[in-house]
Amino acid sequence: MKRVIFTLLLALFAVTTTSAQKAVELKHTADQVVKHWNNQTAPHSNQETKDEYVNEKGYAFCTSQTEFYIYKPSTPKSDKCIIVLPGGGYSGVVMSKGFRIAEWLRDEGITSIVLKYRLPNYGHKEVPLEDTQAALRYAREHATELGIDPAKVGVLGGSAGGHLAAYVSTFTPDAEKPAFAILIYPVITGDSWLGHISSFNYLLGKNRTPEQVEQYSLQNRVTATTPPTILLLSDDDNVVPSINSMLYYKALKHYGVKSTMYTFPSGGHGWAGKAGFKYEKEWHHLLLDWLDTLK
């Protein structure tokens, strides 16, 4: 009898927890939200069977609906548009940090779109890529109403979002690639000693082959047509080692791609879009200055 009661209590707790997760809504100040496709209407599905939910920190999990959160400045100072790709280890999407970055960009007069992408769910690697490509197309197709130049749509991503930004930069046909890429402490390599293995577990699955690891270690995908790129990171990052950025930067330089890299002495991991980072003003200034160097 006690075992039955205990089981019922566990079930009740699970239902209550799930309901609480579903009840949390994303808090944002976007000027417009566009629901794009979902697992039923997109070219590919991530085969997610659980309900999508958001936790109290603004992290989205089990994502099955692609959404664009559009931030438009009241007084535009740039004709560029930045697709913001939040990180989360490919196990979640840290929307709250993406929103904070977009708010800062809006204050600087730059239009941005925060992408809630569908997660790869242990091996559906094409899903986050096609969502990012869809966001690029949307921005270009709606350039007039967004007040931007369709040839100046770039991407910004941190951590696994940085991998996604490099992913779309290196796996997309040249004519459709982003105009530029901003990589912040990005996951780049799937090497078991150097990379963030959890991200590769979610992206490629736990039974991935060495050939897949090599293909999706994105320093191996750089060519002369890879978009101009800036990398920002901290030297003491113990989540995604700085060697990830170094490998990508080395490949960019090898192929003559316009690129630069800034390494802060401290800060660890996850500081972009998070209050309290010692070098927040510095990375903001460095990024804005770099954007000004682009045509």
Positions of the model-derived regions?
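N-terminal cap/lid segment of alpha/beta-hydrolase-fold proteins
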Residues: K22-T75
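Mobile cap/lid helix-loop segments that gate and shape the active-site cleft of serine hydrolases
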Residues: N55, V187-R221, P227
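Short beta-strand/loop motif that positions the catalytic acidic residue
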Residues: T225, L231-L233, D237
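Catalytic nucleophile-loop/oxyanion-hole region of alpha/beta-hydrolase
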Residues: V93-M95, R100, L115-P150, A275-E282
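C-terminal catalytic histidine-bearing segment of alpha/beta-hydrolase fold enzymes
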Residues: M246-K295
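Primarily recognizes the serine-hydrolase "nucleophile elbow" in alpha/beta-hydrolase
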Residues: A134-S199, V213
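Conserved alpha/beta-hydrolase "acid-adjacent" motif
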Residues: N238-N244
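Short beta-strand element of the alpha/beta-hydrolase
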Residues: D79-G87
